[in-house]
Amino acid sequence: FVTIGVPRKQIIISGHSCGGLLTLMLLSAHPEKVGGGISYMQACFGKLSSYYKVKKVGPEAALAKFAKKKPGPAELRERQINNIKKSNNVSVLAFTHPKDKWEGLLSDWLEEVPGVKRIVISQDYKINGKSCVVKGDNWQENISARKNPGHEMSQGLCFQYYNQTILEYIASRLK
C-alpha cells in the first residue's frame, strides 16, 4: 500500500484469533509501519480456557498445567505477551469474550498493555440484549449453537453494535 501512495497512518490492520495476536505483535514491535490495528479474540495456542479449565482452577494453575504439558508453546506464548507488554504504546482496539474457549479467560493481560483499548464483548452470547446470529445466503444460526460461539462473536450480526466504536477508533488514528 505504501508503495502505491497510501500514507502509513491510513493503514489499519486487523486479525482474528492467531491473526489478532499477530496484529498486537506487529503494532508492538513496529508501531511506525501502520496507523493502528484491530484484534479479535487473539489466540494462537489452542483452546486454553476450556482445555485447562481456567474457570475452575484459575489462570495461574491453568497456565502452569499448560507449561508442564506443552513447555515450548507455553514459553513462546509468554515471551510474545511479554514483548507486547514492553511496548510504550500499542495502538490496538482489542475485542475479547470470556466464553471464548481459546483464551477468553486469559485475556486480562491486555489491560497491562499501554495504548490497547480492550472491549469485553459481553458476558453471554448477546450484545446489547440481542441474541447473536450468523447468516449465510440461505441459512442462519444462533451463535450460541455454533461449535465455538465465544470465539466467533465478532462474526455475528449483533456485533454490528460495535461498528460505531470501530469507526471512531479508525477516525482517531487518522488524525
Language-model features: where?
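Structured segments of extracytoplasmic/periplasmic soluble domains
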Residues: 3-4, 14, 25-29, 40, ...
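Primarily recognizes the serine-hydrolase "nucleophile elbow" in alpha/beta-hydrolase
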Residues: 9-57
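The feature captures the conserved acid-bearing segment of alpha/beta-hydrolase catalytic domains
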Residues: 46-121
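Flexible, glycine-rich phosphate/dinucleotide-binding loops
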Residues: 20, 46, 101, 125-128
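Extracytoplasmic/secreted envelope proteins and their assembly/folding machinery
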Residues: 23-24, 81, 163, 167
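Conserved acidic catalytic loop of the alpha/beta-hydrolase fold
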Residues: 1-9
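C-terminal catalytic histidine-bearing segment of alpha/beta-hydrolase fold enzymes
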Residues: 116-175
